[in-house]
A protein has these predicted regions:
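Active-site-adjacent betaalpha module
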Residues: 1-12, 21, 48-56, 73-74, ...
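Acidic/histidine-rich helix-loop elements
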Residues: 23-39, 83
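Substrate-engagement module of ASCE P-loop NTPases
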Residues: 40-50
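Short beta-strand segments at enzyme active-site cores
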Residues: 58-65, 168
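Catalytic-core segment of enzymes that process non-peptidic bonds
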Residues: 62-71, 77
Length: 211
């Protein structure tokens, strides 16, 4: 049986927060993610999916968290817990190594980097939806960090906006198995039309390229 196909005219890969602070040894948040990320083979799988998308000329979009800058949040009346954590830890600090995209995942010319999101959803208060629609994208293959926060929030919002979502379940990670279970087994299945492995999506993209 042929694998599920992805029409590259209307499908894009969405890469969420591949920052050094998340997915590189020495990153501020890596130690919290390391156990689950390594068990899930998260980073190599993310790279495999990204390379497959590029090789098959699938459009690639990036949804990136706000890089911390001095003064961020200081005058806000309310700060969500996840924002407070980013503020206190200066996560993804602008101008630092941790705030850079890991080298293997750096966007190439022609790949679209949406405006940075301030909380969790890659869509909220950014131009991601506009960029996708202006490029004729209706279907998303989603991967990145963190499964129970930015990834889940972005998948939910994508469904609300009418996108058909495929979630790559072994190209993401959370702080614990419990949080991974909540994201991938409980919440995301309500919004993603398909939840697949890296091998499945890579095979699908390769199949499409041969047609």
């Amino acid at each position: 049986m042929a694998p599920v196909t992805y029409d590259k005219e209307i499908t894009a890969l969405l890469v969420i927060d591949p920052y050094n602070d998340f997915i590189s040894e020495g990153g501020k948040i890596w130690d919290r993610l390391k156990g689950v990320a390594e068990a899930n083979n998260c980073v190599p799988n993310m790279l495999q999916v990204l390379n497959a998308a590029r090789e098959t000329e699938l459009r690639v979009f990036y949804a990136l968290h706000r890089q911390y800058r001095p003064g961020d949040y200081e005058t806000w009346k309310y700060i969500a817990p996840t924002q407070k954590s980013a503020w206190l830890h200066k996560a993804f600090e602008h101008g630092t190594w941790g705030g850079e995209i890991r080298k293997e995942f750096e966007p190439r010319p022609g790949e679209i980097v949406a405006q940075e999101h301030w909380c969790s959803s890659g869509f909220a208060n950014t131009d991601l939806d506009l960029q996708l629609k202006k490029h004729g994208i209706h279907k998303l293959i989603v991967m990145g960090l963190i499964a129970h926060t930015c990834v889940e929030a972005t998948v939910r919002y994508a469904a609300e906006l009418g996108y058909e979502v495929t979630m790559v379940k072994d190209a993401t990670a959370s702080y614990s198995d419990k949080e991974m279970h909540a994201a991938l087994k409980v919440n995301i299945p309500n919004y993603a039309s398909a939840i697949v492995t890296t091998n499945e999506v890579v095979n699908s993209l390769s199949w499409d390229a041969l047609q």
